Amino acid sequence: MLTSSLAFDIAQFFPLLNHHLLALILGKAGFDPQVVKFFLNYLVNRKTKYFWNNFSSSTVNINMEVGQGSAFSPILLALYLALVLHILEKHLKNLDLKISILSFVNDSLLIIQSKSFQTSNTCLFSSYNIAFNLHSKFGLVVKHSKTEVFHFSRSQETFSPSSLNLSSLGSPILYPKDTCRSLRFIFDRKLLFCQYIDFYANKAISIVKYMKILSNLIRGLNPQQKQLLYRSYALPIALYGFQIWYYNKAPLSYSLKILGKLQRRAALWIVGAFKTVLTFGIEAITSLIPIHLHLQKLSRRSQLRVYSLSTNHILQSLIENNSNTFTHLYPISLSSLTRH
């Protein structure tokens, strides 16, 4: 089976929310009429003036709809978008399009699994057409310029998926890329995450290089301060989102090699040692945990966070049932992926 995805972005998501439709959604959701009335007039018919020294501008209308920095924005957009996704799922189900939908604020993703890229492209085209028209009816604008298609495959054969022609919808022809960037994550077609690890490791290495400038100050930095600076600033960047590639039976030779080079470079800088010093020795002197043990520690700590969630949280059903809270686990349980 081949997995394909199509990512699209909603332009000016917060300012485009329709107040009247939002009020109908709140009323349908069972909110108090006074609350519905409040949001019906929320940030509507507002005016402002600009003052600069002795200059004052004329009155300007600023109907902001829902402000992006408002504390209400996350809640309102979730209620607004939930209806859009609910209707979209119904349309796709009626057309027998086996598409999965993921959404994070204004970034959405359509995912399909099929036996050929041609079938995937056909389903993605139909699904995107439905999603685009549905968002337009809700007053939301989809950015065609940010729409991307990506195909996943671990086949060792020549990988040449066909392009997706969306020109009839006003979007350009989409050509699959070698990597896909989403929410600061970098995905490759085989999900090996080599480019992802390289990107953040190089970022951390650059930080270690720039840290040397701090050592040239009048007072400089002692080894203890250098070690603290590396652990609190450079290392968290290198290990950003490590849970996505660090799991049971995952190939770790490449990632441990790259991260090991990073830590060795930092350790040499901390004590000012020669490059010929052994890695284990320099890590012991600088009190740095070997990178593979540090990853194990962070992984176990992240797994413990699930116990701080409420018993009816959706993530509880994805993890191994130790407390017998759920009699039936999710069909694709993550218990086999969270042991290391």
What are these regions (language model features)?
Residues 1-24:
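Conserved catalytic palm subdomain of right-hand nucleotidyl-transferase polymerases, strongest
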Residues 4-7, 51-76, 111-114, 218-222:
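Short, conserved non-catalytic motifs in the polymerase core
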Residues 9, 26, 39, 50, ...:
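Mobile genetic element proteins and their domesticated derivatives, centered on retroelements
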Residues 11-14, 62-92, 131:
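Conserved pre-motif C helix in the palm subdomain of viral-like polymerases
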Residues 54, 141-178:
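Short, conserved micro-motifs composed of acidic
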Residues 76-115:
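Active-site palm subdomain of RNA-directed nucleic acid polymerases
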Residues 171-245:
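Basic, alpha-helical interaction scaffolds
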Residues 262, 275, 281-340:
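Extended C-terminal regions of large enzymes
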